[in-house]
Amino acid sequence: MNSIEFPLLARTTQNSVISTTLNDLSNWSRLSSLWPLLYGTSCCFIEFASLIGSRFDFDRYGLVPRSSPRQADLILTAGTVTMKMAPSLVRLYEQMPEPKYVIAMGACTITGGMFSTDSYSTVRGVDKLIPVDVYLPGCPPKPEAVIDAITKLRKKIAREIYEERIRSQEENRCFTTNHKFHVGRSIHTGNYDQGLLYQSPSTSEIPPETFFKYKSSVSSHELVN
């Protein structure tokens, strides 16, 4: 083999051999087979019915919905999360195997929505309970937006490094806290503000001649009727 054949051999070898790392291979296998756990509590969850249909067909992305968190690596939260449901959501997330991802779908999941204005039992954003990878705003988001969020998550999985994700989760871990109500001093004493109440004059303050004159006029009126 002479020196002229070396470049041809190098080009042939480069076109025939795929060079990659175990990390890239792992990311490729995970982004092509996401198994989501659907956690829906409100109207945003209805949009998933359109995704299952033939028009959008989210099975082409390798999505296989699971009913058990131990078999899922993606959880899609849709709808309002209340204080009572917060421990259940955190428990489901902790039961999912690593690596795991979260998509927050809808305004109620991201910020609490319109229910967080006057409600004391609504969580103001699911990211206060579990780490969120992709935020999907809308009320409700369209099925096309859900597919776009899944596409962005696939791109994120393709370029992430597993060791760095584990390290960041250990440093920025979300701990659950019990919601406790503290009994404070009551501001209601049971006494009404006399200045705000209308007090009718008592009979002792009315002159006798006025009182008897009024009583006689009422009696004569009743007799006429």
UniProtKB/Swiss-Prot annotation:
InterPro entries assigned to the protein according to its UniProt record, in alphabetical order: NADH_UbQ_OxRdtase-like_20kDa, NADH_UQ_OxRdtase_20Kd_su
Main location group: plastid
GO cellular component, one term: chloroplast thylakoid membrane
Record SUPFAM superfamilies: HydA/Nqo6-like
Keyword check for Ligase: no
Keyword Zinc: no
EC number: 7.1.1.-
UniProt record, GO biological process: aerobic respiration; electron transport coupled proton transport; photosynthesis, light reaction
Reactions it catalyzes: a plastoquinone + NADH + (n+1) H(+)(in) = a plastoquinol + NAD(+) + n H(+)(out); a plastoquinone + NADPH + (n+1) H(+)(in) = a plastoquinol + NADP(+) + n H(+)(out)
Cofactor remark: Binds 1 [4Fe-4S] cluster.
Keywords recorded for this protein, A-Z: 4Fe-4S, Chloroplast, Iron, Iron-sulfur, Membrane, Metal-binding, NAD, NADP, Plastid, Plastoquinone, Quinone, Thylakoid, Translocase, Transport
Top-rank EC class of the record's enzyme: translocase
Membrane topology summary: Peripheral membrane protein
Role description: NDH shuttles electrons from NAD(P)H:plastoquinone, via FMN and iron-sulfur (Fe-S) centers, to quinones in the photosynthetic chain and possibly in a chloroplast respiratory chain. The immediate electron acceptor for the enzyme in this species is believed to be plastoquinone. Couples the redox reaction to proton translocation, and thus conserves the redox energy in a proton gradient.
Protein name, UniProt field: NAD(P)H-quinone oxidoreductase subunit K, chloroplastic
Organism annotation: Eucalyptus globulus subsp. globulus (Tasmanian blue gum)
Gene name for this UniProt entry: ndhK
